[in-house]
């Protein structure tokens, strides 16, 4: 009989790639139970774990019900506990101090306002300190939060090969997948528009998948400039719906602002782009400088002008999709989960 692993996350199962992959691979080693809120999204079919959906009501009552249910379940069921970092997660460990638990922090604060960022980072730090182990996305992020390194294990981001379709790069077909909160994606829209005006690339397209605060600004720009046949806005898609877009496209947009908030934070999709043969346009943060090389992508500053210039350079560059894919081999999800995450869980 496998040992039980209880994963706690207010976010509905299936809409965080990391946790989809954790369940997929950790189920080989553990009997996984995933406790989450039902946020009204379409449910993922899952035969590798027991998914416990808790009905979403009002914000406060849902959170309270989520916490009560989780306390009761953990109390009466043995097994290791891994929780996502969410506001108040510290109380799981405070109320059940005898249970071995690890908290998994996937991001530091990304607020542009420095005082808000500092306050959120301090909340994340305080929530994490009481746990037996702390999983962090990068060493730089752990240092930024001033976490005790003796309790920290680094578990990076991973990627699967979403598409094995051979790529050519004669015409540029861009893809952005991710959030549109605080990412400055409108800069890439304007940069792509400038590229279209200056280029003879008559078949260039830009597919955008995701949602967030910038969504309406992007839609308005596309409409105002009659770009709907070149810039296609798809809204939110589930992970298992992404393959046709990775098959179609050959350039992956890994664009985050260059500031303290994102200095140690890789966009989740960067590695998926590279592993699927999409040459990456990546903003020049510390993590991208360590992982995106000349055979797999181009590094830029976070401006409209440099985004446009990068597209022009890519069009003139001879790119080999085999070399692009080779750059992503160290970041395959199986390696990340079974070598890094499973090792961390064995410590509790």
Question: PLM ranges: what are they?
Answer:
Residues 5-8, 135, 165-196, 207:
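Conserved donor-binding/catalytic core segment of Leloir-type glycosyltransferases
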Residues 13, 183, 240-242, 254-272, ...:
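Nucleotide-sugar-dependent
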Residues 24, 67-76, 103, 115-136:
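Membrane-proximal helix-turn-helix segments that form the acceptor-binding/catalytic region
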Residues 38, 91-92, 122-152, 159-161, ...:
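A short, active-site helix/loop in glycosyltransferases that binds the activated sugar's phosphate group
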Residues 82-88, 105-106:
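Short His-centered aromatic/hydrophobic patch
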Residues 219-243:
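Nucleotide-activated donor-binding/catalytic signature segment of Leloir-type glycosyltransferases, i.e.
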Residues 294-305, 312-318:
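Conserved acidic donor-binding segment of nucleotide-sugar-dependent glycosyltransferases
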Residues 302, 315-348:
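A charged, aromatic-enriched C-terminal amphipathic alpha-helix characteristic of glycosyltransferases
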């Amino acid at each position: 009989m496998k040992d039980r692993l209880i994963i706690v996350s207010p976010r509905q199962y299936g809409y965080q790639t990391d946790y989809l992959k954790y369940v997929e691979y950790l189920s080989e080693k553990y009997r996984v139970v995933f406790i989450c809120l039902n946020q009204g999204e379409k449910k993922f079919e899952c035969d590798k774990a027991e998914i416990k959906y808790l009905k979403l009501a009002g914000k406060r009552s849902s959170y309270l019900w989520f916490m009560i249910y989780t306390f009761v379940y953990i109390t009466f069921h043995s097994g290791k506990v891994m929780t996502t970092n969410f506001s108040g997660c510290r109380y799981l460990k405070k109320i059940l101090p005898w249970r071995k638990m690890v908290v998994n922090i996937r991001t530091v604060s990304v607020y542009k306002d420095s005082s808000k960022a500092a306050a959120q980072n301090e909340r994340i730090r305080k929530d994490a300190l009481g746990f037996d182990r702390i999983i962090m996305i990068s060493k730089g992020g752990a240092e930024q939060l001033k976490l005790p390194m003796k309790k920290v294990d680094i578990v990076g981001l991973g990627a699967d090969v979403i598409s094995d379709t051979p790529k050519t790069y004669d015409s540029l077909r861009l893809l952005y997948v991710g959030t549109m909160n605080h990412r400055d994606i409108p800069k890439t829209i304007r940069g792509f528009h400038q590229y279209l005006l200056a280029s003879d690339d008559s078949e260039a397209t830009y597919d955008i998948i995701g949602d967030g605060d910038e969504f309406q600004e992007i839609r308005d720009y596309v409409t105002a400039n009659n770009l709907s046949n070149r810039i296609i806005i798809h809204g939110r898609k589930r992970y298992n719906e992404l393959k046709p877009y990775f098959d179609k496209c050959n350039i992956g947009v890994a664009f985050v602002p260059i500031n303290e908030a994102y200095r140690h934070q890789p966009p989740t999709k960067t590695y998926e782009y590279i592993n699927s043969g999409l040459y990456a346009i990546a903003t020049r943060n510390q993590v991208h400088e360590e992982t995106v090389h000349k055979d797999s992508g181009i590094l830029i500053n976070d401006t409209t002008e440099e985004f446009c210039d990068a597209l022009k350079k890519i069009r003139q560059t001879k790119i080999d999709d085999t070399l692009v894919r080779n750059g992503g081999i160290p970041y395959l999800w199986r390696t990340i989960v079974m070598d890094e995450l499973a090792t961390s869980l064995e410590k509790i």
